[in-house]
């Protein structure tokens, strides 16, 4: 059910040296702030960052958010994992 409330995480890996990527990610996250519970940023290599974004909301909304984030130019890998909380 697309309107079911779920929780999960969006995990992305990206090169933090990519021009304008951090700014673009920040704008998307601010646009969807009501769905984002927290963000963890880890430097996993000299050029690579891993970001875990904890999310909660309607399944369809989380899929839309994940699609925008993972589709941002410069994202190397990304995945949305959700679980039922009802």
What is each model feature region?
Residues 1-86:
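Long, contiguous binding/interaction regions
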């Amino acid at each position: 059910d697309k309107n079911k409330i779920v929780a999960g995480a969006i995990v992305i890996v990206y090169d933090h040296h990519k021009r304008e990527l951090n700014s673009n990610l920040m704008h998307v996250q601010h646009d969807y702030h009501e769905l984002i519970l927290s963000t963890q940023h880890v430097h996993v290599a000299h050029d690579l960052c891993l970001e875990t974004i904890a999310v909660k909301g309607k399944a369809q909304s989380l899929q839309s958010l994940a699609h925008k984030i993972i589709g941002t130019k410069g994202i190397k890998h990304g995945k949305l994992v959700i679980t039922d909380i009802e």
